[in-house]
Amino acid sequence: MWLTEAQKFGVAFTFGGFLFFLFGIFTFFDRALLALGNILFLIGVFLIIGSQKTYIFFTRPNKRRGSLFFLVGAFLILLKWTFLGFIIESLGIIGLFGDFFGVIVQFLRSMPIIGPILSHPAIAPIVDKLAGVRVLPV
């Protein structure tokens, strides 16, 4: 997969945003880390897919509610309502990126250590239902 330099930086910014957001959660919802994670994540998405596609992605009719929740949650985090902002922003992230969860689960199943765990007959139906993976009834 060939990426331009801007897209490589976008991947780094997105990953950094994810890490800062995760560290913000681990430090009991630290406002600065959560806000920095949001900013880095948005910059990363912008650099990866470009300005026009970013605008189209966030303003699709089926993604508007997720976009609104994400932005309201980020705004509440900036206003020091970090826990409520985190909950609302998480709902927005699910609304925006919920379609990708099936792809993520399939990718994780191809990994050496976690793949057999996610493919175990007792765990696989639960993970498939949570991720929205459609399985043929055969």
From Swiss-Prot:
Subcellular location: Golgi apparatus membrane
Any one of the GO BP annotations: endoplasmic reticulum to Golgi vesicle-mediated transport
Lumenal side: 30-31, 89-112
Database matches in InterPro entries: Got1, Vesicle_transpt_Got1/SFT2
Pfam families: Got1
KO phenotype (gene knockout): Lack of GOT1 is lethal in a strain lacking SFT2.
Coiled coil location: none
Transmembrane annotation, as ranges: 9-29, 32-52, 68-88, 113-133
Gene Ontology cellular component annotations, sorted alphabetically: COPII-coated ER to Golgi transport vesicle; cytosol; endoplasmic reticulum; Golgi apparatus; Golgi cis cisterna; Golgi membrane
Segments on the Cytoplasmic face: 1-8, 53-67, 134-138
Superkingdom per UniProt: Eukaryota
Topology versus the membrane: Multi-pass membrane protein
UniProt keyword list: Golgi apparatus, Membrane, Protein transport, Transmembrane, Transmembrane helix, Transport
Its job: Nonessential protein required for the fusion of ER-derived transport vesicles with the Golgi complex. Can be replaced by SFT2.
Family: Belongs to the GOT1 family.
UniProt protein name: Protein transport protein GOT1
Organism: Saccharomyces cerevisiae (strain ATCC 204508 / S288c)
Encoding gene per record: GOT1
